[in-house]
A protein has these predicted regions:
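N-terminal export/targeting and maturation segments
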Residues: 16-55, 61, 65
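Short, well-ordered, aromatic-rich surface patches in folded extracellular/luminal domains
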Residues: 17-34, 85-145
């Protein structure tokens, strides 16, 4: 009977998803790939953010809080650049560090990636959105790098 109970306890613990932090988010910014691969991720849920970077001999993980102004800035940049309507190109690229941005909150909800480039007409808008996330990462993780 003890083995039976222990089995169900282990089964219950195994079924708890440790990746929940990474699947339930409002905003996601990630960069990955390249000849010398890197993996960089930023997940934002509410006012909490989780950042990780692996590559180039570094391994950084950091959790931090965001202010309401920082969240409003992200949403404003997404709206000003009409993030949802940015068009991805369909070229095939290899050994390229690509950036992916996923927005699950608000009217600009969409998933975009420059893995096969962004259409020329939308490059400036894409760069504005990516720059906003990049600046946020740089300001919050300067001490961790």
């Amino acid at each position: 009977m003890k083995r039976f109970i222990a089995f169900f306890v282990l089964l219950a613990l195994a079924s708890c998803s440790p990746q929940k932090k990474y699947s339930d988010f409002d905003y996601s910014y990630s960069r990955s790939g390249g000849l010398s691969p890197i993996y960089e991720n930023l997940w934002i849920k509410g006012k909490t953010a989780h950042y990780s970077f692996e590559g180039q001999g570094k391994n950084v993980k950091k959790d931090f809080k965001l202010s309401q102004d920082e969240l409003n800035n992200i949403q404003n940049v997404l709206e000003q650049n009409n993030f949802r309507m940015i068009q991805e190109d369909y070229k095939k690229l290899y050994d390229y560090i690509s950036t992916s941005i996923v927005v699950k909150k608000g009217a600009q909800s969409a998933s975009k990636s420059d893995a096969s480039y962004i259409m020329d007409a939308d490059k400036a808008r894409w760069e504005n959105v990516a720059k906003t996330f990049r600046q946020l990462i740089d300001s919050k993780t300067a001490d961790a790098k």
